[in-house]
Amino acid sequence: MPMQGAHRKLLGSLNSTPTATSNLGLAANHTGAPCLEVSIPDGLFLSLGLVSLVENVLVVAAIAKNRNLHSSMYCFICCLALSDLLVSGSNMLETAVILLLEAGALATRTSVVQQLHNTIDVLTCSSMLCSLCFLGAIAVDRYISIFYALRYHSIMTLPRAQRAIAAIWVASVLSSTLFITYYDHAAVLLCLVVFFLAMLVLMAVLYVHMLARACQHAHGIIRLHKRQSPAHQGFGLRGAATLTILLGIFFLCWGPFFLHLTLVVFCPQHLTCSCIFKNFKVFLTLIICNTIIDPLIYAFRSQELRRTLKEVLCSW
C-alpha cells in the first residue's frame, strides 16, 4: 500500500510500502515522468530494527542493574533507550505483520487487522514523540548541570525527573492517540512538524550556549596558564565539530520524515512531492538508524555504563 496522497494513515499505511526488486531505481509517476525511488529491502529494515532493539535493551539493562546510574541524567538516557526500543520494535512488528498477511501465513478478520494496525500506529507515534522529548530533556539536563552546577542536584532531583518522565509518556500517548484518530486533518501533521522544529531549535540553542560557555572556560584556563591561543582555537574547533555532528545526525535522521509530513499537507498531488512520497520507507529507516546511533552518543560514552554493560553481557 504505497503512499499516494494525504488520505492515508499517518504511520500505518504510510510505511507499508512494497519491497522492490532493486535497491535503487526509477519509478514512473502517473504522468510517466521518472521518479527516483530508493527501495529498502524488508530484510535490511528488520535487521536494522533488530540491532537497535538489542542495543537499547542492553542500555536499559545496564542502567537498571547499576544503582550508581539511578540519577536524573541516566533516567532520561534510559527512557530515551526505551522509547528508541519501542520505535524500532513497533516498526519491526508492523513490517512482520504485513509480510505475514501478504504471504497468507496470517489469516484473520479485517476488523482485527485494523485494530492491530491502529494499536501499532499509536505505539509507533507515541514512542517517536517520546524519543524526541527525551532528546530535548537530556539537553536541558546537561544545560542545567553546566550553568547551575552548584544547584544542579537540588534542581534536578530524582522525584522531579520521574515526574517529568511520567508527564512525557502520558502526553505522548494521549497526543499520538489524537493524531492517529484525526490523521486526515492537516492540522495534525502540522502540529507534528512544529513539534519537531521546536525540539530542533531547543537543542540547537542549548548546545550552542553550552559550547560558548565551554570555550569561555577553556579560554580562562589558557589565560591563567599563559598558554598560546591556538590551543583555545583547537578546543573551539573540536567543540564545534562535536556540536555539528550531534545536531547534524538529529536533523538528517528525523528531518526527512517531517519534510514528508509537511509535503503531505502542502502538495499532496504535486508531481515532485509524489516522487518523494515513494521513499517514505527510506525516511523510516533513517529514524531506525537514529535509534542505533543514540546509545553511541548518549549512553556508551559513560565509562561507568560501559563497565556495567560488560558485567551484564558476562552474566548472560
From Swiss-Prot:
Its main location: membrane. The chain crosses the membrane at residues 38-63, 73-93, 119-140, 164-183, 192-211, 241-266, 280-300. Keywords: Cell membrane, G-protein coupled receptor, Glycoprotein, Lipoprotein, Membrane, Palmitate, Receptor, Transducer, Transmembrane, Transmembrane helix. Pfam families: 7tm_1. GO terms for biological process: adenylate cyclase-activating G protein-coupled receptor signaling pathway. It is found in: Cell membrane. It is a multi-pass membrane protein. One of its GO terms (molecular function) is melanocyte-stimulating hormone receptor activity. One of its GO terms (cellular component) is plasma membrane. Residues 1-37, 94-118, 184-191, 267-279 are extracellular. SMART domains: 7TM_GPCR_Srsx. Residues 64-72, 141-163, 212-240, 301-316 are cytoplasmic. Coiled coil: none annotated. Receptor for MSH (alpha, beta and gamma) and ACTH. The activity of this receptor is mediated by G proteins which activate adenylate cyclase. Mediates melanogenesis, the production of eumelanin (black/brown) and phaeomelanin (red/yellow), via regulation of cAMP signaling in melanocytes. This is Melanocyte-stimulating hormone receptor. It comes from Leontocebus fuscicollis (Brown-mantled tamarin).
